[in-house]
Amino acid sequence: MTANEFILALDQGTTSSRAIVFDRAGTVRGMGQREFRQHYPRPGWVEHDAGEIWQSQLEVAREALRNAGASAADLAALGITNQRETTLIWERATGRPLARAIVWQDRRTAAMCEKLLHDGHGRMLQERTGLVVDAYFSGTKLAWLLDHVPGARKMAERGELAFGTVDTWLVWQLTGGAVHSTDPSNASRTMLFDLHAQDWSDDILALLNIPRGILPRIAPSSARIGETLPEWLGGSIPIAGVAGDQQAATFGQACFTPGMAKNTYGTGCFMLMNVGDAPVASRHNLLSTVGWSLPAGNATHATYMVEGGVFMAGAAVQWLRDGLGIIQRSADIEALAASVADTDDVFMVPAFAGLGAPHWDPYARGTLVGMTRGTTRAHIARATLESIALQSAELLSCMNADSGIPLSELRVDGGAARNDLLMQMQADLLGVPVVRPRVPESTALGAAGLAGLAVGFWSSLDEFGAQWQAERTFEPAWPADVREARMQRWRQAVELSKGWSRPAAGHA
């Protein structure tokens, strides 16, 4: 085995830590995965143990190397991708976390966000950061930690405290505290980062009463930022790529030109579209975010995305399984849905937790409409599957409108992307090809790609992109009038779901 033959990607997710060894062809050569504990100390609170994140990530990195038959000497570089927005603080001198990490799903700062909106800061925050004001993002989580963890604010003011998202925490640990760094894709999810200035916003830091000194420096997503301590993985490895998970997946899917987009089908769906070298202000309350930044001579060049999310995708299928008992396993839905030719005009709006973009109605609730005595469990299964494709098509239409760039094709990944019927539905509703890649590990591959570019493992974006291959392409079969009629019927069903749980006398 020759030196510098592989790239190691660390993929630190919400429920598990993973590590994957890739070769130059983008093929998986070894993998490790460990789940870790979720903490729910109060309703709406979600926490992770920072030490467990680090230990689980270190264990799976060693496991991936063993499974690949590789050592640190065989690695050209290491890349990191991570669950975004999750917020940590630790003592600079010791690396000791002062509290558990507040996870992106955690809602404890919802009231703080409502106050920011009530006080008239919403427009400024959205214009600067590209984000809607929400407890989802790191800024209010960090403010909460400084105000509620004993001694945290005084330590921050004395310069003794460090803040980071999960990527920053892992880099700190891997380098023994030598590097306190993040990248623009993660920084742009904090609600503290000015998209236009490509730096932390002093105005927002003042608004949230956060000392700038606790923030990490911002390095390009593809750049050699430090080296691992030899004791961790048996040798010193350059850390050369960092990106948030959804942006890394977009990079791994080689969506390098404006108009290219990917959709990750999981519990929910995450859609990102490349909009080029300037941020796009959404008219549909989609998020504007940095995809990645690459060195360009003495400067860096950022690529921007618009992002939309579907709350309930695979989760709606799980409800059919666990709530209704219509299927025994989630995988059973494809055969059941395929046993009927269509939904017989049945629509399922899976607004179990409200509706996200472009509707943003927290009072909407799950709705099944169009049923007759002839409706069967197969029709309901097909309508549920189709709801995933309908929601995604609606969001991608908004992305087209915001960006002014027509979608050329949709690249897909995630567990539900293996469902051939769903992928065909998606192509029919979009009117463009839906393409599933040969390598399904898009997120980790993106981190590997960013790291590999920084050290010359791949010489260019074109060379890295050339290893991307389609496993299957789903071509649209519906004419435009059929597609539009289906979308119009869907919009009718969505309107019926809105406002249902509003705590007022009447319903919307």
Swiss-Prot record:
Inhibited by fructose 1,6-bisphosphate (FBP). InterPro entries: ATPase_NBD (IPR043129), Carb_kinase_FGGY (IPR000577), Carb_kinase_FGGY_CS (IPR018483), FGGY_C (IPR018485), FGGY_N (IPR018484), Glycerol_kin (IPR005999). Sn-glycerol 3-phosphate binds at residues 14, 84-85, 136, 245. Signal peptide: none annotated. Glycerol binds at residues 84-85, 136, 245-246. It comes from the Bacteria. Its EC number is 2.7.1.30. GO terms for molecular function: ATP binding; glycerol kinase activity. One of its GO terms (cellular component) is cytosol. It catalyses: glycerol + ATP = sn-glycerol 3-phosphate + ADP + H(+). Pathway: Polyol metabolism; glycerol degradation via glycerol kinase pathway; sn-glycerol 3-phosphate from glycerol: step 1/1. ADP binds at residues 14, 18, 267, 314, 415, 419. GO terms for biological process: glycerol catabolic process; glycerol metabolic process; glycerol-3-phosphate metabolic process. Keywords: ATP-binding, Glycerol metabolism, Kinase, Nucleotide-binding, Transferase. The keyword ATP-binding applies. ATP binds at residues 14-16, 267, 314, 318, 415. Key enzyme in the regulation of glycerol uptake and metabolism. Catalyzes the phosphorylation of glycerol to yield sn-glycerol 3-phosphate. Belongs to the FGGY kinase family. HAMAP family: Glycerol_kin. NCBIfam families: glycerol_kin (TIGR01311), PRK00047.1 (NF000756). This is Glycerol kinase. The gene is glpK.
